[in-house]
C-alpha cells in the first residue's frame, strides 16, 4: 500500500507529522498524537476538512488515497467534571463496597479523605488502586482515566510484612 505523510495541526501544539499508509486505521494516528501530546485517544477529535474521522476506519475509507500528504486538524475535547459514581471495594473476606461520588478534578488526597469517612482507615494507611494504577498524592482523578462505575480497590498497609 502506498505510504504518505500525515500532517496534524492544532491550536495547542506545533505541527506533527507521521509516516502512514492508506490501510492504517485512524486510531494509529490517534496513538501517535497521544505519544507526543499526552492527550488520551478518547479526548481527541481528528478532522479532515469538516469531517470527523472515526478511530476504527482506515484512512483509505475517507477517499484520500491519491494524496501524498494528508492534512488533519486535532481538536481536544475537555471531559466534563460532573460527579461520577465510583465503587470502593475494601479488601478482606467480605469485600465490602461503598459508593463514592468523585469528580475528575478531585485530588487523590480528597478521595482518600472520603474513603476515611466511610471506612475509618486513615489516608496514610490506605493503598488505593484504580484501573490498575496506585493512586498517588499530588495527582487528580482525571490522571487515572476514571469513568462512571470505575472501581477503586482499598487495601491497608500491612505492619511487619
Curated annotation (Swiss-Prot):
Q: Where is the Ubiquitin-like domain?
A: 3-77, 86-159
Give the record's family classification: Belongs to the ubiquitin D family.
GO BP = aggresome assembly; myeloid dendritic cell differentiation; positive regulation of apoptotic process; positive regulation of canonical NF-kappaB signal transduction; protein ubiquitination; regulation of mitotic cell cycle phase transition; response to hypoxia; response to ischemia
Give the gene that encodes this protein: Ubd
- What induces its synthesis? Possible cell-cycle regulation with highest expression during the S-phase (at protein level). Probably rapidly degraded by the proteasome.
What is the recorded post-translational modification?
Answer: Can be acetylated.
**General function of this protein:** Ubiquitin-like protein modifier which can be covalently attached to target proteins and subsequently leads to their degradation by the 26S proteasome, in a NUB1-dependent manner. Conjugation to the target protein is activated by UBA6 via adenylation of its C-terminal glycine. Probably functions as a survival factor. Promotes the expression of the proteasome subunit beta type-9 (PSMB9/LMP2). Regulates TNF-alpha-induced and LPS-mediated activation of the central mediator of innate immunity NF-kappa-B by promoting TNF-alpha-mediated proteasomal degradation of ubiquitinated-I-kappa-B-alpha.
Q: Which organism is it from?
A: Rattus norvegicus
The positions annotated as site (Activation by thioester intermediate formation with UBA6) read: 160-161
PROSITE patterns from the entry? Answer: UBIQUITIN_2
Q: This protein is called what? A: Ubiquitin D
GO cellular component terms listed in the entry, alphabetical order: aggresome; cytoplasm; nucleus
